[in-house]
């Protein structure tokens, strides 16, 4: 028998509300039993006004919280909403137990409807459970739920303004100190990152690779260093130094990405955009990544043509191309490219076999759809007059014959490793001929265009073109300087090419 949606939603509300009040009350009771509960606030907070009317938006979160259960469309959305609320409750509860704080300021006497709401709040609340503010955490989570539901721009703006007022009200009702707000915002964004309403939840993926743990250790060290600087700076200089803890948090999340979360920690979607929660949490790191890319690319070409119409370079140049294969997890998609494929990878580590295979497949798709099947690419390199092994040529021929049957003619791909000056001139001439036929351009990119994107382009040249690994690598190095690929890449790409040949023969 099918359960009616309303009954399921009501049951979920009752269970989650029971967990909320039970855990919230328990942590309040634990804190009240302590002999000394610290209080953290800044001197300027004494100048904050008390607005009795702001208890209305403060209380409205309770109504919006409950109403959300009945706005869920289907069991899946309800399950996601419930999970987000429970994760939010769990995070807050752990902090309330581990780091209890209090708000000791006495509220002015209030009468009327606002007085009734303050009295109702005092009936079950105590001046503990401060940082991170659970009210602010839920403001982020519930606010994101409603903003996702809203379609009209004016409604989104109105909702955003109201939830911002709810967040502000924790100060103007003397319920919280300022430090509870940024910690609550961070916790709320973390909830949305690990359990998003759309897409797969953030999950662990342990990869036994020394380079990953080396970079994880480096970023974890930076996280501790900046946290220490934040605390020390606040003690001996100014409380504003505490904002360095935001930098610390972003580095810690990146460390988790290298250790066990992978590129998913950036929450970059198929449109090349980071989720708002990831962008907020990782903002300091994202700024550092952009500065780092600008430093290493100063005075250098942002992209180089490898084959006619096919370029390798930095994501900073992506807006100038017709099609883009983006391998940079830490950069968002720039505007301009009409055809876009996102394959987020972490920087400074060798792409895995699955990433290389997926990247080669995506690049093949872009070449076919953008460059008219890629015939000009292959013809231009064939004119270099190079020779490959019989096995490589045989596989290339098989692939070309298959494409002839599917979408028209396609030439054999033949090249030699390091091109001399005569070969470069031949390629230049063929490039001019290709431009007359097709002036569209495809870019394979990452932050700098030296590592991740080069690895994917290598995989495509070997898997789909039939080149040997050394020949493909020499071709890239002759076209773009500073190419940096790990030695382990040879084995991975060679194995993928062998598997592709077996599958091709089987078909």
Where do the PLM segments sit?
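Intrinsic disorder/low-complexity segments
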Residues: 368-438
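Membrane-interface loops
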Residues: 28-46, 71-166, 190-194, 202, ...
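Aromatic-anchored segments of alpha-helical transmembrane domains
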Residues: 21-22, 89-95, 161-171, 225-231
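PTP/DSP superfamily signal
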Residues: 199-294, 364-372, 437-441, 452-507
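Membrane-embedded alpha-helical segments of multi-pass membrane proteins
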Residues: 56-64, 133-141, 182-186
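N-terminal transmembrane-helix/juxtamembrane module of multi-pass inner/ER membrane proteins
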Residues: 1-64, 108-109, 118, 262-274
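Cysteine-based protein phosphatase catalytic domain of the PTP/DSP
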Residues: 114-121, 295-372, 435-444, 459-501
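Interfacial helix-loop-helix junctions of multi-pass membrane proteins
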Residues: 130, 165-191
